[in-house]
Amino acid sequence: MREPREHRPDLMSVAASRPGTLAGPVVFWAGERARRHQRGAAVTVHFTYLSGPDVDALAMTDEEILGAVEGGLVAQGRGQTVIEPRVHLVPDPAYRGHFNVLRGYVAPLGVAGMKIVGDYVDNYLHGLPSEMALLNLFDPRTGMPVALLNATAITDMRTGAMTALGARHLARRESRILGHVGARGSSYWNVRLLDRFFRFAEIRVHSRRPESRWAFGEHLARDLGKPVRVVDDWETCVRGADIVVEASRLPEPAPLLRTEWIAKGALVVPYGTMSALELSLTDVMDKLVVDDWGQVRAGRFGALRAHVDAGRLTEATLHAELCQIVIGDRPGREREDETILFWHRGLSLSDIALGHAMLEKARRLGIGQSLRYA
């Protein structure tokens, strides 16, 4: 990683206001803090907490979401980040779920972060979302906590932004048909942000449970102000679509998305935890793009895990990471007839960048709580 520029972010703060408020902090930089410690002076440290309702109250716009995630990609492309590959915790296979732990550092923002997200496929039976997350932001110079955010919405928003930004560089500009499989939390943001770029003439959606896909379709139609076609099977959803997004929630890998359904010149964006792809899918691709090669080349989960293990997706067959395309180091789509696959596993950098943007907006609006840490 390149040596970061000097930053003096307002990160390690000593509260100058009463607990429970978000008034401006008094900042002690590391040297001054050490001198105070040597003099025996007590240092009181608070961090900001943003709950789910707080995050909702921020009313993040599409532009704010896309801008934050794109900023993270630019920093990644310029070598101004540190990404540690995600790790997993499976408490008990009988629970049909696991935890993902994502870690990273974004130098231009002067913040490091760690997100823990639970991924439980049967949570709908308990009236709970399948994915629930917490994001911790830290001062990278001292390790002191800066903020704790409910990151469930962050996960959904940044995933949709990554899908849409990938498509902006990799899909045909005249793409008019979207086929979207899956109705998980991030699915809404996939479709919403993709439609912002492409203004689709036809949007098809499918998911395993009828009640889920119909509710999803109605939600999209209401918010987008256009018809959404709810279909009963994968083939009807996928065949002939200009952009295909596979965001299914399978309990185990199963080749439900057939290679023969993919149209020449299409963009395919698979990111289900359990693979729904045939091994032959990579054979019809002109370009393979990922969010971070270091992250996708190892691990136990992911849409193209079998393709990596079988040697079909390697560093040699990889065209680029999306960040390289965003900053112009590598080309995106070059021909109308190119068939392209973009696999994103989910970047810690996107969580950190969007979480940081939310924290800054919360400070401007006076949203959130200041909690005592030390």
Predicted regions mapped to residue ranges:
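Intrinsic-disorder-associated, low-complexity terminal segments enriched in Asp/Asn/His/Tyr and depleted
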Residues: 7-10, 37
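N-terminal amphipathic/hydrophobic targeting modules at extreme N-termini
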Residues: 12, 19-26, 30-31
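N-terminal ligand-binding/catalytic initiation module
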Residues: 28-156, 164, 174, 320, ...
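Adenosine-phosphate binding glycine-rich loop
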Residues: 54-56, 281-374
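Short internal alpha-helix immediately C-terminal to a glycine-rich phosphate-binding loop
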Residues: 158-179, 185-197
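Residues in the short beta-alpha loop(s) of Rossmann-like NAD(P)-binding domains
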Residues: 184, 208-209, 274
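NAD(P)-binding Rossmann-fold cofactor-contacting core
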Residues: 197-220
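Rossmann-like adenosine-cofactor binding region
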Residues: 225-312
